[in-house]
């Protein structure tokens, strides 16, 4: 791809995108795995004593031999030491002669850093997938298509083409997710406190097929009513993502990707309206509420047993697992967001994760081999077993926590809903996040305080639809 064209596409949207990325989330706090601006300059130091990983006896086919190289990674974490990636990296390093140098930045800094690097002709070779990747950053020519380097017929990608192809941009594949999470956001609860109160265990309700919207609301009511002093609250957490999970449980995503690759809005869908009505009832009844001074990532309300549920990404479960290691009286567990009892199936809000190769990368072939290694850590039995050992040492999960959490990565066992509502552009994405968060929680947002779902939607549907039409127009006209 012509470098001047890459640069023009990147710079065309860089200013507005970067400024919008600094806007407040309005979600009652911040979500450290989605909105962080924290940064460190280089890779962290791995402690082989705490998490030694050996891949010497493993043999996988991640691609043909490549020239040894040092790849540059730009993203949220050290992919050479993280428990779930370290075995893949060690195999890549030892068998393909490649190293990866990590520059770790907050997620809100990735776009700015990537834009600057591409503009200077210093593109990194790997970058995290983020909310703004599709379609925003793809439309700006910020990535390298990987069709020439990846083989969808390879065993590790079996059964995934329907998901990978959803992220095509004008007929080209840029994104091959190596991680698939059917339930990437969970409802975390203090199982020990539930037992003390005499409440039914949500995990048991889930196992029995009884975990529905109504069951969750009933459990929260009983939890709150169990405290005569009125100090217990219901649901808190990642406000917009919790709301999205409830909507997706109807089987209808807010924004879906059609078979023709175009975006389809379902903001006016009757099932989405019904989910919004349910969320507003949770808010009005006080079942979804932040405690005074609490933000969405705070763990004390769950540990102390003063909140029923925290809706949060799986990343936070390791924090609770480590607390349980230090205090064996703690029993923290989690369940998926509940089923919509009016839906024909139990639908789960699916997310994906992986790396893309930025435009201008000099080592796209090597980067593709590494992506294959990461995917094989989920499919090759030997590498998968080594990866589990690494994760357990690194994240301190109990066997029960690990087994339940990782069961949701077998996506063909579930009815997965692919929903991409935040990637239109940073401004519109934030509008959608604000609408969702303020539907489920009383966030006292200056713009939306006191407004209903319908009022917020109608005030913004024109902006949302305009952006959808813009991207669909690019696909029609051939943005290449």
Residue ranges and their predicted role:
Residues 169-180, 185, 195, 212-264:
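Extracytoplasmic/periplasmic solute-binding protein
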Residues 147-159, 205-208, 228, 254-274, ...:
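Short, solvent-exposed loop/beta-turn-alpha elements that line the ligand-binding surface or hinge
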Residues 104-113, 132, 209-215, 291-303:
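Short helix-initiation/N-cap motifs at beta->coil->alpha
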Residues 324-392:
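Extracytoplasmic/periplasmic substrate-recognition and gating elements
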Residues 116-117, 125, 129, 153-194, ...:
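A structural signal for short loop-to-beta-strand junctions that line the ligand-binding cleft
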Residues 45-67, 131-184, 214, 335:
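Hinge/lid segment of periplasmic solute-binding proteins
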Residues 3, 7-9, 19-136, 140, ...:
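Conserved N-terminal structural module of periplasmic/extracytoplasmic solute-binding proteins
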Residues 220, 260-293:
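Glycine-centered hinge/linker elements that transmit conformational signals in sensory
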